[in-house]
Amino acid sequence: MSLIPEIDAFLGCPTPDAWIEAALADQETLLIDHKNCEFKAASTALSLIAKYNTHLDLINMMSRLAREELVHHEQVLRLMKRRGVPLRPVSAGRYASGLRRLVRAHEPVKLVDTLVVGAFIEARSCERFAALVPHLDEELGRFYHGLLKSEARHYQGYLKLAHNYGDEADIARCVELVRAAEMELIQSPDQELRFHSGIPQALAA
């Protein structure tokens, strides 16, 4: 059974058509930033293991997640090599930092907020893969379709951990707050195309 309807309901909005248009027009930047996102996702998981080193269920999930994200990183690198896409610096977008500004500074809510933000990032990744797949060539479309299941599983894992460590009413408030901020980041003009960017300014007018 597809998890996309669940993810669509969790997110506040779908990816705008203008972003899809921009991504299809600049697939090199999209692939490089996708590679970077996979590496950052693995790094985030390892950082959580280091920081919350007495939380066994978190350690187990993040260890698996980090391994999966590094495999995805390697897969994107191989795909880029086959397509002749050269490695070049691509700066981080505003998306993840914009969401992490909402994370409260004190525990235990800092962990819960971090996990909710992680759930939104994974959910948006899944939604964007699904949005792109129908428009891509066979090789890239097949690859992105293959990532849907793991991204959906990561979204579920982050959210499950948040519920393990947090108060239900507080989590509901946090989800609503992050959902509103995430929707604004996705729907508003953005200076650059990134995997999680808003609408590139050239197309936002």
From Swiss-Prot:
Keyword Oxidoreductase attributed: yes
Cofactor binding note from Swiss-Prot or TrEMBL: Contains a nonheme dinuclear iron cluster.
EC number(s) from the headed UniProt entry: 1.14.99.69
Pfam families: MiaE
Single Gene Ontology BP annotation: tRNA modification
Family assignment from sequence similarity: Belongs to the MiaE family.
Superkingdom of the organism of origin: Bacteria
Pathway the protein takes part in: tRNA modification; 2-methylthio-N-6-(cis-hydroxy)isopentenyl adenosine-tRNA biosynthesis
Catalyses which reaction(s): 2-methylsulfanyl-N(6)-dimethylallyladenosine(37) in tRNA + AH2 + O2 = N(6)-[(2E)-4-hydroxy-3-methylbut-2-en-1-yl]-2-(methylsulfanyl)adenosine(37) in tRNA + A + H2O
Source species of the chain: Pseudomonas putida (strain ATCC 47054 / DSM 6125 / CFBP 8728 / NCIMB 11950 / KT2440)
UniProt KW keywords: Iron, Metal-binding, Monooxygenase, Oxidoreductase, tRNA processing
Biological role: Involved in specific tRNA modification. Catalyzes the oxygen-dependent hydroxylation of 2-methylthio-N-6-isopentenyl adenosine (ms2i6A) to produce 2-methylthio-N-6-(cis-hydroxy)isopentenyl adenosine (ms2io6A) at position 37 in tRNAs.
GO MF terms held by the record: metal ion binding; monooxygenase activity; tRNA 2-(methylsulfanyl)-N(6)-isopentenyladenosine(37) hydroxylase activity
Cofactor entry: Fe cation
Chain positions recorded as Fe cation 1 binding sites: 38, 69, 72
UniProt protein name: tRNA 2-(methylsulfanyl)-N(6)-isopentenyladenosine(37) hydroxylase
Subunit structure: Homodimer.
Effect of residue 100 to E: Loss of activity
UniProt cross-references to Gene3D superfamilies, sorted A to Z: 1.20.1260.10
